[in-house]
Amino acid sequence: MISTRHWSAPGFDTMVMGLIFPYAATTRDITVRVAPRYLPDQSDPDAPRHVWSYHVRIENGGSEAVQLRSRRWLITDGAGRCESIEGPGVIGQQPVIEPGMAFDYVSGVPLATPSGTMDGAYHMTGASGGFDVDIPAFVLTVPAAGGH
């Protein structure tokens, strides 16, 4: 899922956005929202392998266009093992996000434990130079039986 679209529709209830994306952080008018989801069909607890997808929405509430140049993730599993991942852009793209627009993407992460956390930052550039945008820390947990 990749899209760039206007995100401030008239009358849109911001509380709804908080329900869809339970994790959010804002840096210099750029809001990063994250919604993780456990994927039981791709997981095998006996392996052990637990897989989550995470939907990220990056909203540009500022007055200038920004380009996402790189990402840095810190992934910590339930045993406290940390992995740092850095690279250019996201999902093979370095999107330009115009003022009042948003960029969405979905990616995934496997862990050997049934819980963990992720956080990090995106490096952005704009007319006023480069800056880092926080990715909110979010929790990865296997839901109770019957949940997703």
Region roles according to the model:
Residues V16-P48:
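Low-complexity, acidic Ser/Thr/Pro/Gly-rich terminal tails and inter-domain linkers that flank the onset
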Residues S43-D44, E64-A65, A112-G116:
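Short glycine/serine/proline-enriched coil/turn segments at secondary-structure junctions
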Residues I58-G62:
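Asparagine-centered strand-capping/turn motif at beta-strand->loop junctions
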Residues P110-H148:
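Terminal connector regions
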Residues S84-S115:
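Intrinsically disordered, low-complexity Pro/Gly/Ser/Thr-rich segments with frequent PxxP/GP/PP motifs
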Residues E64-E83, M124:
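Short acidic, flexible loop segments centered on an aromatic residue
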Residues P48-Y54, M118-D119:
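Short, solvent-exposed loop/turn segments enriched in Ser/Thr/Gly
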